[in-house]
């Protein structure tokens, strides 16, 4: 693993499942929230553009820190390298739902 860990955070927001990558995750001083800093997005290395990742970049443009409610988070993983972030629609009858 790299010296600075990379975290993959999956959370549920407004009927969609978000998957983001970040360098720092903390328990926030705001009760019930997780603080996520230094969001990572893939570099544009060619002609292929992932519309889901572009939507994610646009939504978090200019954001240095995000506070996510603990009850919305479905999973946090420490990963070896950054992947592609995404926003997907939560399917009806899925195991993922809000509390």
Question: Which residues fall in each region the model found?
Answer:
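Eukaryotic intrinsically disordered, low-complexity regulatory linkers and tails enriched in Ser/Thr/Pro
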Residues: 1-99
């Amino acid at each position: 693993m790299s010296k600075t860990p990379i975290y993959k955070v999956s959370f549920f927001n407004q009927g969609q499942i978000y998957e983001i990558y970040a360098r720092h995750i903390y328990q926030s001083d705001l009760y019930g929230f997780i603080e996520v800093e230094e969001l990572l997005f893939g570099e544009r290395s060619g002609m292929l553009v992932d519309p889901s990742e572009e939507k994610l970049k646009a939504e978090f443009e200019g954001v240095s820190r995000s506070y996510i409610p603990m009850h919305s988070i479905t999973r946090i993983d420490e990963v070896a390298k950054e992947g592609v972030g995404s926003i997907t629609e939560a399917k009806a009858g899925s195991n993922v739902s809000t509390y």
